[in-house]
């Protein structure tokens, strides 16, 4: 794993509304604004010790990017806690309950969410994830140890928990498994190269980069039909079933971002765009009739580029919120 996994601090705020629900499920509230509980450290990568497996205590607000065994023990009532987990793009994350000692009847809870929720927004979005939002939660207080292991649908997952009684808590083991066709991804790094392949599947896939970046698309293959590529549509991509769009915004949910460009015909690049937003997304929409593929490189914009963005970048929309 790369040692320089960093996220914009204001993107890692856990809203009180995501943790203070009275129901058994956590509701995503889009409009409310709350003060953050805490900012995560800018340097989130943990050094992997030579001993295996890696073990350490889990904090009330935490982020981890490597497998291991993690134990949370309350030293006082901890009512608004969340742990974020992220793997490599080509990995699933499995969360296994080793030991759980919480008081469900007394208001404690321990819930796994398939994806991330930040500032009331979800990744993957409801449009991109195969399950409805409520099905993406696994509540220990409902299932108990009958379901000891929960595997994510992508390279990110998170745990919400509340523990009232000091001394209570839980131990979980985080493992990763290979994902041959990663669909929805949050990048651990501000620069890299990736090929997104969707083979004959009717689904939407988003690759999220939580930095202002320059994206260069070097290869795009869409709509192979009997060995021939579909012709370029007369106008726009709205009428096609297979296309790639570039999105930008200040939140995490791709469905709430601004479309900056769309591509719906094959080409051999390069095509480049600077996206000055806090979050940039390469999103592929597939009809399921073809094998679609897009290869792209991305790098974080330098400060001087943010100040002097011109040409085919989109500074007006994004920089106003920085």
From Swiss-Prot:
GO terms for biological process: behavioral response to ethanol; cellular response to calcium ion; cellular response to cAMP; cellular response to cocaine; cellular response to estradiol stimulus; cellular response to estrogen stimulus; cellular response to gonadotropin-releasing hormone; cellular response to immobilization stress. Keywords: Disulfide bond, Glycoprotein, Secreted, Signal. It comes from the Eukaryota. Its main location: secreted. GO terms for molecular function: corticotropin-releasing hormone binding; peptide binding. It is found in: Secreted. Glycans are attached at residue 204. Residues 1-24 form the signal peptide. Disulfide bonds join 60-81, 104-141, 183-205, 237-264, 277-318. Coiled coil: none annotated. One of its GO terms (cellular component) is dense core granule. Binds CRF and inactivates it. May prevent inappropriate pituitary-adrenal stimulation in pregnancy. Belongs to the CRF-binding protein family. This is Corticotropin-releasing factor-binding protein. It comes from Mus musculus (Mouse).
């Amino acid at each position: 794993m790369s040692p320089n996994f960093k996220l914009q601090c204001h993107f890692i705020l856990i809203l009180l509304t995501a943790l203070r629900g009275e129901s058994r499920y956590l509701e995503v509230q889009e409009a409310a604004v709350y003060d953050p509980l805490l900012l995560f450290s800018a340097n989130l990568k943990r050094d992997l010790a030579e001993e295996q497996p890696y073990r350490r205590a889990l904090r009330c607000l935490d982020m981890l990017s490597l497998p291991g065994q993690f134990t949370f023990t309350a030293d006082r009532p901890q009512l608004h806690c969340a742990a974020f987990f992220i793997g490599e793009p080509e990995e699933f994350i499995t969360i296994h309950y080793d030991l759980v000692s919480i008081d469900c009847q007394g208001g404690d809870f321990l819930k796994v969410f398939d994806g991330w929720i930040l500032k009331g927004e979800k990744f993957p979005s409801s449009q991109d994830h195969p399950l409805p939002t409520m099905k993406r939660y696994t509540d220990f207080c409902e299932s108990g140890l009958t379901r000891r292991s929960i595997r994510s649908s992508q390279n990110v997952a998170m745990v919400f928990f509340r523990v009232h009684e000091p001394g209570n808590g839980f131990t979980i083991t985080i493992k990763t498994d290979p994902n041959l066709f990663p669909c929805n991804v949050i990048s651990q790094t501000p620069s890299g190269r990736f090929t997104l392949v969707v083979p004959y599947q009717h689904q939407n896939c988003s690759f999220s980069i939580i930095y202002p970046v320059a994206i260069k698309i070097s290869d795009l293959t869409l709509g192979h039909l009997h060995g021939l590529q579909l012709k370029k549509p007369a106008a726009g991509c709205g009428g096609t079933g297979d296309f790639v769009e570039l999105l930008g915004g200040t939140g995490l949910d791709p469905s709430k971002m601004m479309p900056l460009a769309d591509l719906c015909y094959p080409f051999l690049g390069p095509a480049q765009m600077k996206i000055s937003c806090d979050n940039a997304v390469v999103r592929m929409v597939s009809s399921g009739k073809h094998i679609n593929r897009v290869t792209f490189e991305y790098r974080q914009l330098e400060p001087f580029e943010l100040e002097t963005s011109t040409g085919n970048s989109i500074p007006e929309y994004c920089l106003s919120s920085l």
